[in-house]
Amino acid sequence: RDVAPSRGLGDVYKRQRKGRVKMKAFLILEDGNVFTGTSIGSTREVISEIVFNTSMTGYLEVLTDPSYAGQAVVMTYPLIGNYGITPDMESERPWPDGYIVRELSRMPSNFRCEGTIQDFLEKNDIPGVAGIDTRALTKILREKGTMNGMITTNENYNLDEIIPKLKAYTTGNVVDKVTCTEKKVLKGQGKRVALMDFGAKNNIAKSLNERGCEVTI
């Protein structure tokens, strides 16, 4: 049966009911392991370093954390997106190259919700995979170490061609992408703190400032 949407989420629910045709997506690791799931977000192909995050909440903070630039993030918690997109961002934009989840909630419920993860990923051209065993994937990464991988919707992928590309891939200098381009100052009456921005989250400066510090970024 249909569940009545929370107030203010009518448009979100209408979009989700329309949905889109489910498309297969594949996560190919450089060790030859292949995980098959459903495409979420953008359908473009991407090669990236694969890392995992064990947070039970705060998926939006993870998506907007500059320290994940140049990486595709695996969320180990099984259900992601149940409260939608809220204003709780750690920067002005999302940074991961890809997003990998066990199950993506397409009907969020939260009075602060401004959209869905699916919409957010599509808008920011971030490809992802849902419906795979993220804990099995995390176990591989934990035992073998961080490795490169490819997210693709191409069902005719060729492992013999892809694996050498994955092994040769490097993330490059991501600091240039995430650092601020000009000095910022958060006024305070206490100690003066210099925050070097090599991908600093908004909450670091905010927390220092809330404790009375004048923060120069």
Language-model-detected regions and their locations in the chain:
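Single conserved hydrophobic/aromatic residue that forms the stacking wall/gate
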Residues: R1-Q16
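RNA-binding accessory domains that recognize and position tRNA/RNA substrates
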Residues: K22-I217
